[in-house]
């Protein structure tokens, strides 16, 4: 049997130069900025250390239709707020490579049959800010852009630190 471990882009610390168009690869050294990222990184290490057949799958901002009982995702949050005529604040200085849940499913299915152990990034090809994601949702759904308010990470004042940039390359998974 093969062990598939789902991980996250939050294992990274934003130190790569996004201005140069660089995305994190599977070979980049994790340096998480929060406890969630730290526990995922340590989980990756334990899987690699103890499993003889494994794949570590890093995903970022997974979106798609949520099943009953599941929490929503960025697409549903933006869509629901805008449809209700509610304003939404979104960060404009955090960049991710959002991932469609169907692509995660397809990638995991392929990795189950793949003989090589290792880390694989399964995410979208486009790196964009959270605000850009919100605007794309509004465009796709024909909803009001004026309700979207881009703010900086500092202005959002979240209690848990998040990496400003955690865009991942999917070259290895291709």
PLM regions with names:
Residues 71-76, 101, 130-134, 166, ...:
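A general structural signal for well-ordered alpha-helical segments in protein cores
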Residues 34, 96-99, 128, 168:
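Residue-level signal for the nucleotide or nucleotide-sugar donor/cofactor binding architecture
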Residues 172-174:
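Short, intrinsically disordered, charge-balanced linker/junction segments flanking boundaries
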Residues 46-96, 103:
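NAD(P)-dependent short-chain dehydrogenase/reductase
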Residues 105-107, 114-165:
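Mid/C-terminal beta-alpha module of Rossmann-like enzyme folds, strongest
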Residues 8, 59, 153:
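Active-site loop/turn elements of alpha/beta-hydrolase fold enzymes
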Residues 2, 11-57, 61-63:
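Catalytic helix-loop patch of NAD(P)-dependent Rossmann-fold dehydrogenases
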């Amino acid at each position: 049997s093969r062990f598939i471990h789902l991980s996250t882009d939050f294992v990274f610390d934003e130190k790569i130069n996004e201005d140069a168009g660089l995305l994190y690869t599977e070979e980049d050294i994790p340096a998480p900025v929060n406890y969630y990222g730290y526990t995922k990184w340590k989980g990756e290490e334990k899987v690699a250390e103890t499993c003889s057949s494994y794949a570590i799958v890093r995903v970022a901002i997974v979106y798609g239709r949520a099943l009953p009982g599941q929490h929503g995702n960025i697409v549903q949050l933006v869509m629901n707020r805008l449809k209700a005529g509610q304003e939404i604040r979104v960060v404009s200085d955090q960049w991710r490579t959002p991932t469609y849940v169907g692509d995660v499913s397809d990638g995991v299915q392929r990795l189950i049959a793949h003989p090589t152990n290792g880390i694989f990034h399964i995410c979208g090809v486009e790196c964009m800010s959270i605000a850009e994601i919100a605007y794309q949702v509004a465009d796709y759904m024909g909803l009001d852009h004026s309700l979207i308010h881009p703010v900086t990470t500092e202005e959002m004042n979240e209690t848990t630190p998040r990496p400003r940039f955690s865009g991942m390359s999917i070259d290895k998974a291709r």
